[in-house]
Amino acid sequence: MAKTSMIIKAQRGSKFKVREYNRCPLCGRPRAYYRKFDMCRICLRKLASAGQIPGVIKSSW
């Protein structure tokens, strides 16, 4: 879990647009962020496995 101070710091607007970065709103993780789902890969996998994200299915071939 991310430090609370880092999550709050990321939510605040930056003086420069380039310095802003995305964080997962569920766990606060800054890396492996999927813009389409607005969450990190770990939370995406957890929610997709539970069937809580509509339209996402497990692939098999």
UniProtKB/Swiss-Prot annotation:
Keywords: Metal-binding, Ribonucleoprotein, Ribosomal protein, RNA-binding, rRNA-binding, Zinc. GO terms for biological process: translation. It comes from the Bacteria. Zn(2+) binds at residues 24, 27, 40, 43. InterPro entries: Ribosomal_uS14 (IPR001209), Ribosomal_uS14_bact (IPR023053), Ribosomal_uS14_CS (IPR018271), Ribosomal_uS14_sf (IPR043140). Gene3D superfamilies: 30s Ribosomal Protein S14, Chain N (4.10.830.10). GO terms for cellular component: cytoplasm; small ribosomal subunit. Its cofactor is Zn(2+). One of its GO terms (molecular function) is structural constituent of ribosome. Transmembrane segments: none annotated. Binds 1 zinc ion per subunit. Part of the 30S ribosomal subunit. Contacts proteins S3 and S10. Belongs to the universal ribosomal protein uS14 family. Zinc-binding uS14 subfamily. Binds 16S rRNA, required for the assembly of 30S particles and may also be responsible for determining the conformation of the 16S rRNA at the A site. This is Small ribosomal subunit protein uS14. The gene is rpsZ.
